[in-house]
Each structure stands twice: as C-alpha cells, then as structure tokens.
Amino acid sequence: MAFLKKSLFLVLFLGLVSLSICEEEKRETEEEEHDQEEDDKSEEKRFLSMIPHIVSGVAALAKHLG
C-alpha cells in the first residue's frame, strides 16, 4: 500500500511539474508575441513619419527635372 501511495505522489508531482513548465512556456510565447507586435508598430510609425520627406524629395526632383 505504501508503494502505491509513493507511486501516486510521484505521478502527481511529475504532472504538476510538467504543467508548470507548459504554463511558463506559454507565458514566454505570449510575451514574445507582444514584443513582436510592439516592434511591428514602431516600424510602421517610423515608415509613416518618413512619407512626407519622401514626397517632398520626389516633388523637388520632379520640379528640378521638369
């Protein structure tokens, strides 16, 4: 009977450990996705802020050539 109790406790312990590891990996994955979204947004903002400079450069070039 004691052997069965020890085996049951071991199985429960290993199950809890694996569950904890899975939850930790899930949190890390969610954090990485969140960081990636923030990086994408900042890249988009940088690109959008460059558009007026590009347009004025093209207009100046067209004026110079035209």
UniProtKB/Swiss-Prot annotation:
Keywords: Amidation, Amphibian defense peptide, Antibiotic, Antimicrobial, Cleavage on pair of basic residues, Cytolysis, Fungicide, Hemolysis, Immunity, Innate immunity, Membrane, Secreted, Signal, Target cell membrane, Target membrane
Composition-biased stretches (Acidic residues): 30-41
Tissue localization of expression: Expressed by the skin glands.
Alphabetized InterPro entries for the sequence: Frog_antimicrobial_propeptide, FSAP
GO terms for cellular component: extracellular region; membrane; other organism cell membrane
Cystines in this chain: none
Entry keyword annotation includes Iron: no
Modified residues (Leucine amide): 65
Signal peptide region: 1-22
Primary localisation category: secreted
Described function: Antimicrobial peptide with high activity against Gram-positive bacteria, moderate activity against Gram-negative bacteria, and moderate activity against fungi. Acts by causing bacterial membrane disruption inducing leakage of the intracellular content followed by cell death. It adopts an alpha-helical amphipathic structure in membrane environments. Also shows highly potent antiparasitic activity against Leishmania species. Shows moderate hemolytic activity on human erythrocytes (LC(50)=33 uM). Is also active on human monocytes (IC(50)=23 uM).
Protein name from the UniProt record: Phylloseptin-S4
Organism: Phyllomedusa sauvagei
